Design a protein with these regions (language model features):
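Nucleic-acid nuclease catalytic cores
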Residues: 1-16
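Non-catalytic C-terminal interaction segments of nucleic acid-processing enzymes
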Residues: 15-49
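Long recognition/docking surfaces used for binding and targeting
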Residues: 81, 85-177
Length: 362
């Protein structure tokens, strides 16, 4: 069909194919909003995600990358995480205007899409400098400009920093599980179980916390969130105001304390290198600190740990590597929250490993 005719009473309107150009807008403005709000959001207009809508957005973006960029699910997942990191870094870049955005016009044409990619790539350079433990200096966003513009348009209206941590955690851990869990019988502890365990243990601010089978880092994030709530109450009592009324200096001091805690008091081990990276990302996404997340088989006796792992652990704790040699010399942690990797699909039958444990000894 090359055209259409509409009639109302005595008036007629003819429309030929190609006569009208349609603009694909990023979103629908709110009742009291404008197109500017959906094209270049301000910090005050960012929305908190609720229920499962963040999970839906993450899945939609991941599927878009998988289909349009031709990436398998795992590479597509890590490309999505690069963009999510850019979104978080941009939100933290106070008081500068937000740069993580695409206008509807940019998204609809190749030149605009290239402009978006250049803008987001500039943010990613800051991400790499800030998180050198996660990204290499030569890493880059590999998405096509068209795909990147679409992903940005889906994420730009949300505040990932202010969204409830349980909503972020559920969205992150489900998409990690779908892409990194593999076929080794791995499973991730339900969030309500993690919260119950952490509340029972009640970790304190200056206690070293370890998850020796950290998976995606859910236990570590839950424990640190518990401690941050205590820290917020302490700061509010000292300042005399709730967090929403703190000045810039107080917020910076609070965030610096959180980063210091993550760097010195939170440790995670996992045998899967991809999950080690995913845990670091989870820690940064929720608490602005990647912690000390190391790859190792924590079931092995300490004297069988690799020299590289022992060196990194010793440096993080602040001891000499020679001190990390057996069970009697590694009591450096105050709290251990973990779900050990024992199960019907991943049986551990090595007597050298099992004889270390009273309940697993055969």
């Amino acid at each position: 069909m090359s055209g259409a005719c509409g009639q109302m009473g005595s008036k007629k309107k003819y429309i030929d194919k190609g006569q009208i150009d349609f603009m694909d807008y990023n979103d629908i403005p709110s009742a009291d909003g404008s197109l500017d709000d959906i094209n270049r959001p301000k910090r005050t207009s960012l929305k908190n995600a609720y229920d499962d809508n963040l999970l839906f957005v993450f899945k939609t973006c991941h599927n878009h990358i998988h289909v349009n960029d031709g990436l398998q699910k795992q590479p597509a997942f890590f490309e999505l995480l690069k963009v999510i990191f850019c979104k978080i870094e941009d939100e933290r870049n106070i008081p500068n205007p937000l740069e993580f955005y695409t206008t509807s016009e940019e998204r609809s044409n190749p030149d605009g899409q290239l402009t978006v990619k250049k803008r987001i790539s500039k943010i990613f350079e800051r991400v790499k400098k800030k998180h050198g433990k996660i990204f290499d200096s030569n890493d880059e966003i590999k998405l096509a400009p068209r795909s990147l513009a679409y992903i940005v348009s889906e994420l730009q209206k949300y505040s990932l920093l202010n969204t409830n941590i349980d909503i972020k955690g559920k969205a992150y851990e489900e998409i990690v599980g779908a892409n990194l869990r593999g076929d080794r019988g791995e499973f991730f502890t339900p969030r309500n179980v993690m919260k119950m365990v952490v509340e029972m243990i009640n970790p304190k601010m200056d206690e070293r916390v370890l998850d020796s089978s950290c998976g995606t880092g859910g236990f570590l994030v839950t424990a640190m969130t518990h401690v941050i709530a205590d820290l917020e109450r302490e700061f509010s009592a000292q300042i005399g105001r709730n967090k929403c009324d703190w000045d810039g200096d107080s917020i910076r001091a609070f965030n610096d304390r959180i980063s210091d805690m993550a760097s010195h008091y939170y440790f995670g081990f996992d045998i899967n290198p991809d999950l080690v990276k995913a845990t670091k990302m989870n820690m940064v996404m929720n608490n602005d600190g990647s912690g000390n997340i190391l790859q190792t088989n924590s079931l092995l006796p300490p004297h069988e740990w690799t020299d590289e792992f022992r060196t990194k652990l010793a440096d993080a704790i602040g001891v000499d590597k020679s001190e990390i040699r057996n069970h009697n010399t590694i009591a450096y942690f105050d709290v251990i929250v973990t779900n050990p990797p024992f199960g019907s699909k991943i049986p551990v039958k090595d007597k050298n490993i099992l004889e270390q444990f009273e309940l697993a000894h055969i």
